[in-house]
């Protein structure tokens, strides 16, 4: 097995990817549009590119299904259906999955380590975001470390608001983190942290920031 990149390097790459997405979109649209107007995959592609530059870069998969991720992370590859049924998980896509990079002997020996949800134009706590956090918690939660190869999950986002908004960016950020914290706290053997959130102000226009909410097991 190859050496997997350390968590902080991955998080920094995610933030750098979103920063690069913002620079590119602003330049490409000649300062006419903000990043929040970009299509959903815009963040994903830029983040994947930055992670791909890391030393010991992992295998990177865009829009992998939850069933495939579980198949590549549970001890028994055939247990994913029972796991999903037991935890009330509907199959759908996750933005990015990072797998161990090695020479494969078959098309069924991948090992998933990190899962990510990337959201653009985040301004308030939405059910969609809370559902992503809940699902990722269920995928990470376990009684023993060896019950899954998944190490952590990242919910990364770009937030921007106009200067006329009722709530400022810091209030919105605090509400988002508080909401996510309550979900993580309802699951055993999990902890969370937040990186980013440095709010940038644009005079007479508004505020923006980039955040990475990280969930990991404590075993």
Give the role of each language-model region:
Residues 1-52:
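Charged, often low-complexity linker/regulatory segments
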Residues 96-100, 111-122, 136:
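Conserved catalytic cores of phosphodiester-cleaving nucleases, focusing on short active-site segments
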Residues 35, 59-108, 200-204:
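Active-site metal-binding core of divalent-cation-utilizing nuclease and nuclease-like domains
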Residues 17-25, 47-55, 136-144, 173-188:
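Hydrophobic, Leu/Ile/Phe/Ala-enriched alpha-helical segments that form helix-helix packing faces
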Residues 55, 101-108, 140-148:
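Alpha-helix termini
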Residues 107, 123-135:
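Active-site-adjacent loop/helix micro-motif of nuclease/hydrolase catalytic cores
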Residues 141, 147-219:
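Domain-level recognition of nuclease-like catalytic cores that cleave nucleotide substrates
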Residues 121-126, 161-165:
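Short acidic, S/G/P-rich loop/turn micro-motifs used as interaction or catalytic elements
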